[in-house]
């Protein structure tokens, strides 16, 4: 049995697009949620408001980290796609003479 690698270029392109769309959708959803919360939070005061904003900073940082990971996965998929295509071109050129 021989080992070989098979790449689905269309699938890789689709995967990259899905990760990019997911990263944007995540940011849009969080921005929308924060906008809805701000209207209600403006009525809070004192320790409750301060506690919320402290946690909000942590959530924002975690959401940004998550968005960065999703975006990096999209980049990794694109790089894999490009590398597989380059390898296929190189292998094809061997037979082209």
Swiss-Prot record:
It comes from the Bacteria. Keywords: Secreted. Its main location: secreted. The keyword Secreted applies. GO terms for cellular component: extracellular region. It is found in: Secreted. Forms a tight 1:1 complex with EsxB. Forms a complex with EccC and EsxB, probably wholly mediated by EsxB. Belongs to the WXG100 family. ESAT-6 subfamily. May help regulate assembly and function of the type VII secretion system (T7SS). EsxA disassembles pre-formed EccC-EsxB multimers, possibly by making EccC-EsxA-EsxB trimers instead of EccC-EsxB-EsxB-EccC tetramers. This is ESAT-6-like protein EsxA. It comes from Thermomonospora curvata (strain ATCC 19995 / DSM 43183 / JCM 3096 / KCTC 9072 / NBRC 15933 / NCIMB 10081 / Henssen B9).
């Amino acid at each position: 049995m021989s080992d070989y690698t098979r790449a689905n270029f269309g699938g890789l392109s689709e995967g990259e697009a899905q990760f990019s769309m997911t990263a944007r959708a995540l940011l849009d959803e969080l921005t929308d949620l924060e906008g809805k919360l701000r209207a209600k939070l403006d009525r809070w005061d004192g320790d409750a408001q301060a506690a919320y904003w402290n946690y909000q900073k942590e959530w924002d940082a975690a959401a940004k980290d998550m968005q960065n990971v999703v975006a990096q996965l999209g980049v990794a998929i694109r790089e894999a796609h490009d590398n597989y295509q380059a390898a296929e071109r190189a292998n094809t050129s061997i037979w082209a003479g």
